UniProtKB/Swiss-Prot annotation:
It comes from Corynebacterium efficiens (strain DSM 44549 / YS-314 / AJ 12310 / JCM 11189 / NBRC 100395). PANTHER family: 39S RIBOSOMAL PROTEIN L20. This is Large ribosomal subunit protein bL20. Pfam families: Ribosomal_L20. Keywords: Ribonucleoprotein, Ribosomal protein, RNA-binding, rRNA-binding. The lineage of its organism: Bacteria, Bacillati, Actinomycetota, Actinomycetes, Mycobacteriales. Gene3D superfamilies: 6.10.160.10, Ribosomal protein L20.
Amino acid sequence: MARVKRSVNAKKKRREILKSAKGYRGQRSRLYRKAKEQWLHSMTYAYRDRRARKGEFRKLWIQRINAAARMNGITYNRLIQGLRLAEIEVDRKILADLAVNDFAAFSAICEAAKAALPEDVNAPKAAA
C-alpha cells in the first residue's frame, strides 16, 4: 500500500483554523493547538446562544408589554388573560412592537382586553 503524505491537507486545515481564530486574544490566535481549542469552544457557545437568544427576546418583549400595559392601568398577566378571553390572537413580538411604536393601537388592545375580563372578585367593594 502506498504511503500517504498529509502535509498539504494538514497545512490547509491548520490555516483554516488559524484564519477563523483571528481576533482571539494572545496565543489563542497564533498557536494552532490553543486556537483550535478556543475555536471549538466558540462554536459551542455560538450554538448554545443561538437557542438562548429566543428566550432573551421573549423576556424583553414581556418587559416592554408589561411596562406599556401598566401605563394603561392593567398588569401583564391580566392583559394576556383578557386577550385570550376576547379571542384576540396577537403574539408578544407584535404586542411589544405596538407598545413601542404605536401606543394608541396598544391602548385600544388594552381596552378590549379589559372589557373581556370578568369582574375582579378580589377588588375592594365600593361603599354604597
